[in-house]
A protein has these predicted regions:
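N-terminal beta1-alpha1 cap of cysteine-dependent amidohydrolase-like domains
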Residues: 1-112, 123, 127-130, 134-173, ...
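Conserved G/P- and acidic residue-centered "switch" motifs that form tight phosphate/ATP-binding loops
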Residues: 115
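The feature captures the ABC ATPase H-loop/switch
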Residues: 118
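A short helix-to-beta-strand connector/capping loop
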Residues: 177, 215-217
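Short, basic/aromatic recognition patches
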Residues: 183
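Active-site-proximal beta-strand elements of phosphoester/diester hydrolases
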Residues: 220-223
């Protein structure tokens, strides 16, 4: 067996060719980031998979990355109001991820959540979500540009500051009190889940990063897209996160 740990990357259900083909897919940057900065071997976990198959996968990997996705977690998982009919959903991913999180926790396996991933962890621990953050009093518009011709640089540009909480993991990691991040999300954390800890808040008070209380391994989840060019100087925190995740996976493997 190879010396590097294996990380399972959650996929999304993508509908192609007017519904004639459905694929399990994830963004190339997630795969690239875990290979280059976490130094792990990536495998893709289908967004639709039986629980017993999932158990077999978890026996053979050493960490899980919960990726972002176009669809939002359906509100019936946290007692919210029903989505409008045109809201993108991914019920298979909802079921799979809300199943995989407690399995990972029971194994004390490293877990890293990004964008939708932080929301899934919060819901898994009994928390709730805002459907539209920008419609809440005092909250910013955290969404990406709405125009069709927006460039990737415009979509992923650094948008707002996040402030680290008093005993935040991030303060220890980079010896700073805050950091500037991108922002591409419509939903966000409302009520914090049980046994979760707030690690960072945005300037408008929205929860931007969490961890699992007293977890013996890496359990960081962030609302921003840490996978976007971690190698850039302005994104050095994100590079550190992937490196720390990789070290935790290696420790878990050993």
């Amino acid at each position: 067996m190879g010396s590097r740990p294996i990380v399972g990357i959650i996929t999304n259900e993508i509908v192609n060719f007017n519904g004639r083909q459905i694929s399990h897919s994830t963004g190339k940057r997630y795969v690239k980031s875990v290979m280059e900065f976490a130094d792990v071997v990536p495998v893709l976990i289908p967004s639709s998979i039986p629980s017993d198959n999932l158990d077999e996968i978890l026996e053979n990997i050493h960490g899980v990355l919960l990726t972002g996705g176009r669809a939002n977690v359906e509100p019936h998982h946290y007692g919210g109001s029903k989505f409008p009919a045109d809201e993108p959903i991914d019920p298979d991913r909802d079921r799979t991820v809300l199943n995989i999180i407690p399995k990972c926790v029971s194994k004390k396996m490293p877990i890293f959540g990004i964008c939708r991933g932080i929301q899934e962890i919060n819901v898994s621990f009994g928390g709730t979500l805002f459907y539209r953050v920008h419609q809440q009093d005092g909250k910013f518009d955290h969404r990406m540009p709405r125009n069709e011709d927006a460039t990737l640089e415009e979509i992923f540009k650094l948008k707002h500051r996040v402030d680290f909480t008093d005993n935040s993991y991030f303060k220890e990691l980079i010896n700073k009190n805050n950091f500037v991040v991108n922002s591409l999300h419509g939903q966000g954390i409302d009520k914090l889940g049980n046994d979760l800890v707030v690690e960072a808040n945005s300037e408008d008070g929205l929860i931007e990063a969490i961890s699992i209380k007293n977890y013996p391994s890496f359990s960081i989840a962030v609302q921003w897209h840490a996978e976007y060019h971690p190698e850039r100087k302005e994104n050095f925190l994100n590079k550190k996160l992937f490196e720390s995740f990789g070290k935790a996976c290696l420790k878990y493997k050993s």
